[in-house]
Amino acid sequence: MFFERPKDDIEFDVIVVGTGHAGIEAALAPARLGLRTLILTTNLDNVGWAPCNPAIGGPAKGIVVREIDVLGGEMAKTTDETMINVRMLNTGKGPAVRALRAQIDKYAYSQMMKNKLQSQENLVLRFGLVEKILVKDGKVYGVVDSFGIDYRAKAVILTTGTFLRGKIFIGRDTMEAGRMGDLPAKGLSKSLMDIGFKLSRFKTGTPSRVLKSSINFSKMIRQDTDDEPRAFSHFSEPKVLPKDHPCWLTHTNEKTHKIIRDYLVYSPLYGKVKLIQSVGPRYCPSIEDKVVKFNRDSHQVFVEPEGKNSQEYYLNGLSTSLPYAAQIKMLRTIPGLENVVIVRPAYAIEYDYIDPLQLYQTLESKLIEGLYFAGQINGTSGYEEAAGQGLVAGINAAMKILGEKPLILKRSESYIGILIDDLTTKGVDEPYRLLTSRAEYRLLLRHDNAHIRLAKYGYRVGLIPKWFYEKVLNLEKNIKLQIERLKNVKVPVSDRVNDILVKLGSTPLKEGTKLYNLLKRPEISYNDIEELDSERITDKELLEQIEIYIKYEGYIEKMLEEVKIFEEYESVDISKINLDKVPNLSTEAREKLKKVMPRSIGQAMRIPGVTPADIANIISYIEK
């Protein structure tokens, strides 16, 4: 036929829609596992783009990046290659809340991710605005783009970000867009609704970008990169960055707030005509939200570089949808921004998302077999949350095609597991953001032990090398051996020992003890007393794990006991029981259980509206 296309141009194993942080991981995983993968985007020049803050990581999110890395993802490596300022956060607090946050060169990051996609074997990156999902007999079999070109696949992964019927707001002015400068995807929303998916609207926003030469940095507080070597990836060599791209801190003031209040009448959120009806992110409010809801004299503004060679700076903390006139006036009341020039205005964007209760924990749709969802389309916010979902969706699409066991991460072993469990068990009523407070066992889910927790899964699915997995196993073995050894290293009472302890502000010994017991003291580190150990530990990674365990042993052991109970409930499979036959279930519980379709008793216990009495009835039914 004259218009017939070659088979290899039409047929793929996996199709990924969208090249944001979720789409990249969703496409690389199956391609690396040997499956022919197509990834479609409306803008080939914005692959892996950072449309909001030019940063990766932060509390909880930085740990997610580490988890992505050890499961075989790419985000950590590319961040290490393109970061221009990096800091370990919460160093004055316990290890559970420490996390890396890096400013990236967003242009270099995007180009590097594009190169990685285009150089990956089994992967095709192509322009395409997807308008329709192809479904037959309850199974997905492909997509159709805006040119009427159809592609066939065994699995489709939607990672559409803010593009589904995206609409931008600057004051009372509106524009249809996936983000500033990009086309929205309108047909795809209709296709999903026609299939039977429930869609709702969320909103988010981004601040102005301003010209570097118009900023007076002398009125701001400088924040340099860390002096210690840092890396997100377990496969990168930690490095100290040059201090030539600092971030800067300034503050709003009452003049700023007065201008914001004066212009609220023109706000699409607070004006007489409320153009935006949808809910925005609780943990990243707009500046007008802050001024209206919080009675404070000032708010922090972090002024962040967007790249090594970029003349644009990002104003973290000043997201707004106020009209342009309000934006320029309020910025010029802020110290250091008195003569600022706006390069790109701030805006809010409203977009469609699906109810994530329509998904299994594999991120496959309950409605259509082989159709997966990841990222903001599931009601989440954040690059890291998106990338984590994308990786899990990509792995599970591949596992399904290859006939292998799916990857379902537990709450007790990863932040990605918490994220997906919350989405698929509780749903969302606002853009979801990961927080350390969402973790029941956060002392077990640390920045420093992501590889110990998850390497077995990365290796099992085939995305991390054998040598790395064996290295992790060896580390685990050595941690146990060294802890037992330190329990037996004797420290006698002596003037030498007590002099060391007094200098460290620690209580002198009255009787002999073990080195292990000295290390339990919060004011003492191993390096302080290493001369008391005849077999000195020189491996920094090994030493870090040992010290954390010894100092927090009581808390860690208590959590491990709680995890055992948690996993007992998680192991009771209820996915195949007929809920209509379970006696004495409340009507609400029966409805919620049918909607969520929990995999286990443990998941059922976390569904809002399901009571302990309902759980007892299910257990009683199973035991009979």
UniProtKB/Swiss-Prot annotation:
- Give compartment(s): Cytoplasm
NAD as UniProt keyword:
yes
Q: Which family does it belong to?
A: Belongs to the MnmG family.
Q: What does this protein do?
A: NAD-binding protein involved in the addition of a carboxymethylaminomethyl (cmnm) group at the wobble position (U34) of certain tRNAs, forming tRNA-cmnm(5)s(2)U34.
- Annotated GO biological process: tRNA methylation; tRNA wobble uridine modification
On subunit structure and binding partners, the annotation says: Homodimer. Heterotetramer of two MnmE and two MnmG subunits.
Cofactor(s) needed: FAD
Entry superkingdom: Bacteria
> Which of this chain's residues are annotated to bind NAD(+)?
280-294
Q: Does the keyword Cell membrane apply?
A: no
What does the entry list as the binding residues for FAD? 18-23
**PROSITE patterns tied to this protein:** GIDA_1, GIDA_2
Name of this protein: tRNA uridine 5-carboxymethylaminomethyl modification enzyme MnmG
**GO CC list:** cytosol
GO MF terms on file?
flavin adenine dinucleotide binding
Cite the entry's keywords alphabetically. Answer: Cytoplasm, FAD, Flavoprotein, NAD, tRNA processing
